[in-house]
């Protein structure tokens, strides 16, 4: 039958905790643990082959997606992730035109996966993933026509006692919030705008209430128009003024730059 391999981030691991969980499992013959460097494609492929894996579930920072995605292809494994391959802004018109979009790397290789007869389901977490399923359900069962699919995330990013405390990967937070957000319209296709644009107050249900949300780059806008018949697709996040202020300061200081810098001869 083979086995499933879940890739965890090399920068976020504790092998003792992994062993602790493993020791509590009733059927130790069904599970195993191993150290793996998620940036090392060869290492991933060797471990997948050694364990006769048939599924690779990628649960790490999307900066590692390409090599894990390619490792799954090379080893014939079904592949799933919760965030798609990264984007690159347009070199001269970043706030109006798309450069390399989220997931482009994966979609460009779709035909090769089909020909090989293996399955890849990128973006199958909550956002993206569950939100896309909800949208498809709405199209199939609730509405005759859809003007806009608007994903609204009312996340509370404040933690008492901390001035700035993202609740997931700090780098992913900086990148997705400061990258040009993507919007899709039926007559225009995909285009970009400035970060934190088009603020609106959305009244969330369940006692959450009104929260200001702004445009943020997210996979749903790249996925939904491919399968949902709508006139517009957007994603907005409830970041809050303080959180946005910190992000703008990081950008002003150049601390959002992915390029290597040299300090006293060290990169």
Segments from the language model and where they lie:
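Rossmann-fold cofactor-recognition segment
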Residues: 26-40
């Amino acid at each position: 039958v083979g086995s499933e391999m879940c890739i965890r981030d090399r920068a976020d691991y504790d092998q003792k905790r992994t062993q602790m969980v493993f020791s509590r499992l009733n059927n130790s013959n069904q599970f195993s643990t191993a150290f793996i460097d998620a940036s090392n494609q060869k290492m991933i492929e060797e471990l997948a082959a050694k364990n006769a894996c048939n599924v690779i579930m990628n649960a790490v920072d999307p900066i590692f997606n390409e090599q894990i995605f390619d490792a799954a292809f090379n080893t014939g494994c079904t592949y799933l992730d919760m965030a798609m391959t990264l984007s690159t802004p347009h070199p001269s018109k970043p706030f109006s035109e798309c450069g390399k979009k989220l997931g482009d790397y994966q979609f460009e290789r779709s035909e090769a996966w089909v020909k090989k007869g293996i399955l890849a389901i990128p973006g199958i977490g909550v956002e993206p993933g569950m939100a896309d399923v909800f949208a498809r359900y709405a199209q199939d069962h609730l509405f005759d026509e859809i003007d806009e699919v608007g994903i609204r995330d009312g996340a509370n990013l404040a933690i008492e006692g901390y001035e700035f405390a993202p609740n997931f990967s700090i780098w992913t937070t900086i990148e997705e919030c400061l990258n040009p957000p993507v919007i899709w319209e039926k007559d225009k296709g995909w285009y970009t705008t400035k970060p934190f644009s088009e603020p609106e107050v959305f009244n969330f249900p369940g006692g959450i209430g009104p929260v200001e949300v702004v445009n943020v780059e997210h996979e749903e806008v790249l996925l939904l128009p491919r399968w949902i018949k709508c006139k517009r697709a957007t994603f907005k996040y409830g970041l809050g003024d303080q959180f946005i202020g910190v992000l703008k300061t990081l950008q002003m200081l150049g601390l959002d730059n992915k390029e290597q810098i040299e300090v006293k001869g060290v990169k």
